[in-house]
Each structure stands twice: as structure tokens, then as C-alpha cells.
């Protein structure tokens, strides 16, 4: 609610990353976000997760003011995937151990310890891994570092949603994967988000994904949301329409080469 964040204030490197940004998400909203370079997409995510505090404004989650809540407290109810598939897991720990840590991170019990993961929990881990259809349920004792990038990102997605988060943040989580693996992880994402009715924000550079996934398309520029497209308007909208509306609202054309290239790729597919 009216969130602002400025880095290096009062210096020649001053950068207003978020400018009075206002966004209300309804429960179950799945909203892809696209935007120009430096639009504030990752800054928005970092403000939500508590990586830093907003200078002004309020961040509310499920009716609770979390604006100045510690990052580790928020992590119990916020799922977050990064572009780098290596960021979400501990490579020297086994698949089972990584899942146990993710499970314990979300618990509110003060008596939850790593050694207290029960056989029933391990059985549940195995069942959840089987849903990925990657054979990881038979490799639970193997270090995560032996997995491919796609397998690690799929595992991270599973870990982030083992206990349904109040919001799931996906920061270009398929961008570093090969096309086939990216499609599989994206398919898993759609399935999990839909089945759990998870409220989700997903940064993407793919304009077609931005219009086809979820129920809402957001476009950012210069630290604010300049477009919020839903309903029938979104269903009828083409990528060219979206780019045209962005130019009108932002007062300039989109300057993200990756996004513009995805438009060409989509038209040739």
C-alpha cells in the first residue's frame, strides 16, 4: 500500500526503485509481472520478503502488517524462487534433508527439531517427490548437488509449497533452464498453484506467458505498476495490444530486449 524505496539517498547514485506503489492481490490471484529494465520487479519482491524494509508505505499479508517484520519470520509464510536454480537448495545435503529443513522452516512449533522428522513425514516427502515425475523419490538419500538445474528448481518449487504459503513469489524461475526443462517446471508451477489456490506473483520476460498464465497481468515501469489487466480485456488482448497500452501509460516504449525477443519467438512458434 503506497510503498516507496530509495537506494543511496542523498548521493549521486540515488535510485528511487519503488515509487508509491499500490497493489492489492485477492486470494488465489496468479499474476505474471513484466516490465522494463530496472522497473522495480525484484525490488518489489525483496520488499515483500523483508530482504530490506520499505522507506514508506505498508505491506499487508492476510490482514497482518508485515512492513517491519523480520525476514526469517516472513519466510514461514512466503515462498520464493529465484532465477538461479542453485539458490533454493543446500547442495551438500540430501534431498530428504533439504525437504526436512523446508518443512521445519514453515512450522510454528518451538519444539520442532531436524532430528524429529518422523517416518510419516519422510513418507509424505516421497509421495510429493513422486508428483514431480522426475524419479527423485528414489534418490532421497542423494546430495542435491548431484541434480540437474531443472531438477533442483522443481525441488525448490516443491519445498516452497510443501506447506501452502500465503503468497508465492517466482522471480523468472524458469529463465535459466533449457526450453524443455523450463516448460516442465512451468507446467508443475501451474498445477501446484491451481490445485492449492496459491496467491502468486511471477516475474517473466515472456509476453505470451504474461497473458496466458494466471488471471491477471501486471506491467511495471520506473518503480510503479502502470498496467493491471484482468477479465475479458485480458482474454482478448494480444501481445501487440499490451505493448501499445504500456507505451501509452508509461510514456515510452518497452526497452527490455529479452521481452521483445520473446514476442518474436512467440509469433514464430
Please provide the spans of the model-predicted regions:
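H-loop/switch region of ABC-family ATPase nucleotide-binding domains
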Residues: 204-205
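A short, flexible loop at the N-terminus of ABC-type nucleotide-binding domains that lies
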Residues: 6-20, 70
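Helix-to-loop junction immediately C-terminal to a conserved catalytic motif
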Residues: 49
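ABC ATPase C-loop
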Residues: 160-161
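ABC ATPase NBD coupling module
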Residues: 11, 65-79, 87, 111-118, ...
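Conserved ABC transporter NBD signature motif
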Residues: 57-64, 227-229
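ABC ATPase nucleotide-binding domains
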Residues: 235-269
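The feature captures the beta-strand-to-loop junction immediately N-terminal to the Walker
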Residues: 34-36
